[in-house]
Amino acid sequence: MSKIVKVLGREIIDSRGNPTVEAEVHLEGGFVGMAAAPSGASTGSREALELRDGDKARFLGKGVLKAIEAVNGAIADALVGKDAKDQAAIDAIMIELDGTENKSKFGANAILAVSLANAKAAAASKGMPLYEHIAELNGTAGQFSMPLPMMNIINGGEHADNNVDIQEFMIQPVGAKTLKEAVRMGAEVFHNLAKVLKSKGYNTAVGDEGGFAPNLKSNAEALEVIAEAVAAAGYVLGKDVTLAMDCAASEFFDKEAGIYNMKGEGKTFTSEEFNHYLAGLVEQFPIVSIEDGLDESDWAGFAHQTQLLGDKIQLVGDDLFVTNTKILAEGIEKGIANSILIKFNQIGSLTETLAAIKMAKDAGYTAVISHRSGETEDATIADLAVGTAAGQIKTGSMSRSDRVAKYNQLIRIEEALAGRAPFNGLKEVKGQA
């Protein structure tokens, strides 16, 4: 009853008004899975390729009809008649058929949408929720946990039209006992942050990921206003709520000059100077996690950063590792960072995503499941976080339905698991157990 009978692709719209790929996989017995590919703004140069049409007369060149054609043509032809329960085989067929290193023939957006839709269809045919099916695929059947959210409540960098260089300032409700309580705490801090910003005359418009995007005097001021909001919500900073940042430093790295140019503050740094700048913020605020603290190619700088901060806080590689096991293996061998951000469209299939999570965990690295800045209502990452017991999730702020869809799915899953998925809070963060 899990044989594929039809594969269908369509062009839908993401949260930035750009087209993306949605796929349906239909099985014998009437079981159907549907999934959509997300899209990033600050992308690593070694990510799998997102195939766009380039026809300026449609969607300013961002159409995905070529990827849809691949789904409805070559991919559908290859998968009809195959067993959807064998996820590894389904993904391998698509990867082999594409035949390129970075999935540039069909597009990672096409392959991923089908990969995830297939997993959903297989779960339906087994009569189980997606997170349970993912746990079985992962070889960890029945082992679940609820992830600690990293909530991006101030957006800067490529995610906002403001003068803040650092891309994300996040809170983690570590004092919560459950995921549902963590969401409530995050919402309370978010609403209090709106009041704090308004009281200072700042704009409260939101960025791509639902966080506020004001023009601020400095990156440190972003942390200061969040600290005020945490206190105003009745929580203790460092005890109930901790802080995290995504620098997305590749976006302000001047490759020719070899310097980090923070235009918002009018400052430039060498790698070593920027590492010490970050270390100063860690001393000043209860920051427990920093993502992409340097440019993706600055491995010598990352080695220094890991020496400087790696035993104190979590250092997450996003553009650095791009959910790629080859690159992650090199990072592990060289002692670079201590955590990986998991974005399945960076690599382009569920099987490869699970392999990256496993490699990280086996090496003592943490794995943080993440959305992209261009999202849809698809909430698969919530099931991925629970089904792999990854421990942490990054899925935006407390506004925009493309973000809260994931939190709402986590609330439903926690309720369904009724105590079988512990919420471990700060223990999940590298260096904080």
Swiss-Prot record:
Q: Which gene encodes it?
A: eno
Give the similarity note. Answer: Belongs to the enolase family.
Listed under subunit, the entry gives: Component of the RNA degradosome, a multiprotein complex involved in RNA processing and mRNA degradation.
**Membrane-spanning ranges:** none
- The identity of this protein, by name, is Enolase
Q: In which pathway does it act?
A: Carbohydrate degradation; glycolysis; pyruvate from D-glyceraldehyde 3-phosphate: step 4/5
Q: How, per the record, is the cofactor bound?
A: Binds a second Mg(2+) ion via substrate during catalysis.
Which residues participate in Mg(2+) binding?
A: 246, 291, 318
In this protein, the active site sits at: 209, 343
Give GO BP annotations, semicolon-separated. glycolytic process
Question: What does the function comment of this entry state?
Answer: Catalyzes the reversible conversion of 2-phosphoglycerate (2-PG) into phosphoenolpyruvate (PEP). It is essential for the degradation of carbohydrates via glycolysis.
Q: Which GO terms describe its molecular function?
A: magnesium ion binding; phosphopyruvate hydratase activity
Q: Which Pfam families match?
A: Enolase_C, Enolase_N
Which domain of life does the protein's organism represent? Bacteria
Q: Which UniProt keywords apply?
A: Cytoplasm, Glycolysis, Lyase, Magnesium, Metal-binding, Secreted
Kindly list the places in or outside the cell where this protein is found, as annotated in its UniProt entry.
Answer: Cytoplasm; Secreted; Cell surface
Query: According to its UniProt record, which reaction does this protein catalyse?
Result: (2R)-2-phosphoglycerate = phosphoenolpyruvate + H2O
- Name the cofactor(s) required for activity, per the record: Mg(2+)
For this record, an example GO cellular component is: phosphopyruvate hydratase complex
Q: What is its EC number?
A: 4.2.1.11
Q: What SUPFAM superfamilies does the annotation carry?
A: Enolase C-terminal domain-like, Enolase N-terminal domain-like
Matches recorded under PANTHER family: ENOLASE (PTHR11902:SF1)
Listed binding positions for (2R)-2-phosphoglycerate are 167, 343, 372-373, 394
